[in-house]
Amino acid sequence: MMDFNSSSSISCQVSALIDAGLQKRQAEQRPRSYLGASRLGVSCERALQYEFAKAPVDPGREHPGRLLRIFERGHLSEESMIQWMRQAGFDLRTTKPNGEQFGFAALDGRLAGHIDGVIVGGPDGFKYPALWENKCLGSKSWRDLEKNKLAISKPIYHAQVVLYQAYLELHENPAIFTAVNADSMEIYTELVPFDAALAQRMSDRALKVISATDAGELLARAYQDPTHFECRMCSWQDRCWRQINDGR
């Protein structure tokens, strides 16, 4: 029997109900049929290949409700930033006239991405049009970004930005990247110049992952030790290292 006098019991119950609802919604969503540009910067091509091929994650590695709530926080933060940017005088466009999100598709639609927005005008000191991308980060991650800048601190996000700049032909002006500190609500902004070499490497990587998957070839793992931090955090750690018995 539930103890209604216990705040911890009530908290656990409500959290569990919310998480179940979020997990149900996620399960009902149609899975991507393409390789997302937002993921191409991950360190391990094999993990990226598992993700693209929709390989089942290891038992117990499904996204917990708490992580889904963090994802939801990011969406809500983005909506707030859109309003704040517009109130600050930026002419920020986030959808086409028909309501669809701006994006691109390449490689017969098997590589695709959707951007947060395009800023077509606004205050002095910026060049327009400019790609706009926004993230919501915990304080530790945000501080690291502030200290080391996007390319070093968040290489996945950096790859995402330059790919969008390339495929949407927004490469002539620096992207405007913003990040909200979820704890303090501080806002970090960085002007991100186009990196043609990185965009080409990421585009080549997409083709490599798609081609290898079509051919049934398993790409090399990025690390040689299953206890490496990246491997321990990977949703396919067990699946990947079981392959070693097959000489792969």
Q: Where are the regions that the model predicts?
A:
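Metal-dependent nuclease catalytic cores that hydrolyze phosphodiester bonds in DNA/RNA
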Residues: 1-131, 138-140, 151
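Short, solvent-exposed aromatic-acidic interface loops
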Residues: 135-139, 182-183
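Metal-dependent nuclease catalytic regions and adjoining charged, substrate-binding loops involved
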Residues: 5-6, 144-158, 163-248
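Conserved active-site beta-strand-loop modules that form the wall/rim of enzyme catalytic pockets
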Residues: 127-134, 172-177
